[in-house]
């Protein structure tokens, strides 16, 4: 892993001039989107926070709320519930506390939510385990909200991607309350899959493929035990979600994306030939420009966005994905905006993988993504 240097970003005041300099100093989109690093100290660093980026929307940016979700009910492969413990055992919390200088809150245990999982949970509208997923995500929303309303950055470690119903709902509600309705969150969804199926368009019935449809209101149910607890205060606008890294999208999802004008960047956009190149840097500029510079951001990162070369231990791997460096860069760019308010890392499954070291490599990749999102720098 090689995070970007702070010196790569613009500083306050005019740049030094030189008669021999050939550097192009014209502002780019990234220059306009990424907060200026001023010579005076930012508002808050935490104990020894290495980030030099001033937070726009957090009153306590040095405080990090941790929600560890040991839940796998949104899909059918066991093991993803073991991811938070594996991330803890890898030393992630010590890295966040000692290397990045965060004050950690709520990080003592992995939540398994056994009290919320019914013994009998038949399908509803084709959804598998609907009562369990609904009840667990409601609890997660409450946990994330409790941190976010205090003005803390929130990190949720999953678990499968169905948990984003809860994480994003909790963030959305807290931001609306903290800013008296004047702000709504945007979501950057980094994933090989769109996860925007409705119960009716899903071929599998797995709810981890449906969270965005419930969060945007494209899928609804009046019964609280089937996600009826999601209210307007929990929802996000289709105009404030951006996908990055898509490469395995169901036919029904493609129709939903087109009909709703949802901004999405596939691997094709990232990999365009040089003469019409986007590349990950240009894609991030366009993604952030779409969101706007004055919008709180919730970053939801599915590790299967990475190519299986980098993250083999995940439930639905798809070849042809992001490199780890590209994934780290996405996280670094989002951090550099100063707009980040919440991060999810999901779908690490330590029990899956083609080789002995697969789980270790995937956990290590997940830790790298988290550290980059939370401000790790080389200098």
Where are these regions (language model features)?
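Serine residues within intrinsically disordered or low-complexity segments
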Residues: 2-4, 18-21
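PEST-like, low-complexity acidic/proline-rich intrinsically disordered segments
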Residues: 1-12
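Conserved alpha-helical scaffold segments that buttress catalytic/binding sites
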Residues: 10-13, 24-379
